[in-house]
Amino acid sequence: MSPLANRRFLKMHGAGNAIVVLDLRGTAVRVTPAEARAIAADVHSRFDQLMVVHDPVTPGTDAFMRIYNTDGSESGACGNGTRCVGYALLDDPAMARPAENGALTLETKAGLVAVKRITERSFTVDMGQPRLRWDEIPLTEPFLDTRRIELQVGPIDDPILHSPAAVSMGNPHAIFFVERDPDSYDLGRIGPLLEAHPIFPERANISIAEVTSRDTIKLRVWERGAGLTLACGTAACATVVAASRLRMIGRAARVALPGGELSIEWRADDHVLMTGPVYLEGEGTFSPDLFAGIDG
């Protein structure tokens, strides 16, 4: 039987991004890719990201998070999921531990992130510094200027999309800036083609963004390993960084996604702050049948 059988989970969302939070602190249990795919496929625990909370690794941190996509792959960052974990560790009766000033320091394989409560249902996450060098994003070609890279969709003389910005927020992003509604593009078709493009050795999140004013952006996202999503916090952060580098906006903006709005600020110290909502939908336990045929 899988060690995940009968374990409790929280079903949450942040700006429409479906999140499942699983607490494995105090155990040596690790989620396998096959188990993550099984959880994602079940109607009761379907997610965009699975946030698994482990005991802290680095002294001074509150927990270590592993982040799984629906295809079982791991991600280094998930802003919406991090806000949900912040809520769980501060408010959930079964998970909460004492925390100073409603603030936590969490660790992922991409580094440290700080999360702080702003209101009862709103949290700010310090997503750290964006990575802008081609080899840090990473890309397979040595672009000296990642504000625009050579990539396009459609005919050479009349491309549908072209010259995206490239940014890493702990995971790679390509952002196409357009002058009409992002909903008018078939991102469900374009996204998977570009996600796996050879220029992205670790695959990439693909976004289409329209800057609608000096402090507002409309965004659609094809998420690496998950597909079309109602919201993606790291994509919102990457988009604000990219738009600011191109002088389309200042250093802060409200980003409108299909699932809701996120407020992003790229501070002078190079850290990116993301503020947004958290909603608890309910809780459940994993049925042993969910993992039938899977070795734990």
Swiss-Prot record:
Q: Which family does it belong to?
A: Belongs to the diaminopimelate epimerase family.
GO molecular-function terms, A-Z: diaminopimelate epimerase activity
Copy the pathway line from the protein's UniProt record. Amino-acid biosynthesis; L-lysine biosynthesis via DAP pathway; DL-2,6-diaminopimelate from LL-2,6-diaminopimelate: step 1/1
One GO term under biological process is:
lysine biosynthetic process via diaminopimelate
State the Pfam families in the record: DAP_epimerase
InterPro entries with a match to the protein in the record: DAP_epimerase_AS, DAP_epimerase_DapF
Know the name of this protein? Answer: Diaminopimelate epimerase
- According to UniProt, where does the site described as Could be important to modulate the pK values of the two catalytic cysteine residues lie? H173, E223
Q: Any keyword Cell inner membrane? A: no
